[in-house]
């Protein structure tokens, strides 16, 4: 059965896009902030910075101590997390609808007041390196995924994994992180999505209160290299110690906005 959503949209003067869906079936909400940046926006030398930065977003701001963001959400009956993809980075809180303002306040705060320090970078760098070892270097499925994408794409940024290459994770600098923050973590590069037990007009007022004063940034006019048209089969064989063979096959298809994609 198809789920029908009655979506309402509001645009702040600073470019922030707000999407709402009102649903009073339970006294809970899901609050999400999606930034239009992922590993696709990286370049050789700083691959993995989008995912590394996701980790650093939990390490405190001018007004919130390290890890306090998650503690405050949990103390008020909620959960929070984040994820990075090739195209987007998202942060979310699921919590009682009475605590909507808390989630809005915390997310707005770290959009503009994040504290980036050498100690934080050093700490999270090691966490991400260990994550990479676990999910890719010591994982057959991880090796297969890396081999698949690096073979299917030779020019487009999809060719590297979201977590990045280990050599780049090792050398990403604090200045790289600060430049990344200034460039992408800005209201005119973000979409706020709020679902659940809300009053749309009151919700707009709360979002305007905390996000409305944040100044937009001038977004870079990025040119993503286009992949050459593939005219024949590409193949990569990986030889590893395993009990049975693994196989992965990928096909290039048009982008999601193409008329050839059924909707």
Regions found by a protein language model. Give the residues of each.
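Short pre-active-site segment immediately N-terminal to the catalytic Zn-binding motif
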Residues: 38-46
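Non-catalytic beta-strand/loop surface segments
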Residues: 1-39, 65-98, 135-189, 213-258
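Non-catalytic, conformational "gating/processing" segments within enzyme and secreted inhibitor domains
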Residues: 125-126, 175-210
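Active-site SXXK
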Residues: 47-61
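Non-catalytic accessory/assembly modules
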Residues: 119-123, 139-147, 198, 205
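Bacterial peptidoglycan biogenesis and beta-lactam-recognition machinery
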Residues: 58-62, 112-119, 199-201, 211-217
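Acidic/histidine-enriched alpha-helical segments
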Residues: 115-133, 199, 218-232
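M16/insulysin-pitrilysin zinc metalloprotease superfamily fold
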Residues: 60-63, 94-125, 259
């Amino acid at each position: 059965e198809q789920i029908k959503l009655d979506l309402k949209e509001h645009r702040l003067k600073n470019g922030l896009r707000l999407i709402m869906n009102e649903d009073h079936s339970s006294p809970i909400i899901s609050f999400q902030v999606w930034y239009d940046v992922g590993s696709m926006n990286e370049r050789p030398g700083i691959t993995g910075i989008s995912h590394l930065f996701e980790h650093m977003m939990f390490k405190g701001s001018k007004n919130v101590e390290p890890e306090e963001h998650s503690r405050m959400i949990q103390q008020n009956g909620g959960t929070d997390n984040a994820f990075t993809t090739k195209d987007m980075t998202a942060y979310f809180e699921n919590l009682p609808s009475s605590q909507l303002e808390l989630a809005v306040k915390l997310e707005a705060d770290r959009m503009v007041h994040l504290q980036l320090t050498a100690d934080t970078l050093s700490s999270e760098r090691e966490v991400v390196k260990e994550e990479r070892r676990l999910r890719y270097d010591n994982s057959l499925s991880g090796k297969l995924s890396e081999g698949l994408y690096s073979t299917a794409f030779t020019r487009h940024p999809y060719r590297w994994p979201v977590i990045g290459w280990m050599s780049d994770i090792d050398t990403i600098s604090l200045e790289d992180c600060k430049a990344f923050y200034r460039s992408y973590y800005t209201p005119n590069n973000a979409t706020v999505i709020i679902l659940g037990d809300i009053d749309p007009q009151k919700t707009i007022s709360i979002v305007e209160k905390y996000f409305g004063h944040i100044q937009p940034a001038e977004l870079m006019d990025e040119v993503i290299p286009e992949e050459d048209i593939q005219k024949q089969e590409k193949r990569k064989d990986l030889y590893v110690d395993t009990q049975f063979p693994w196989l992965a096959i990928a096909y290039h298809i048009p982008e999601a906005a193409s008329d050839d994609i059924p909707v």
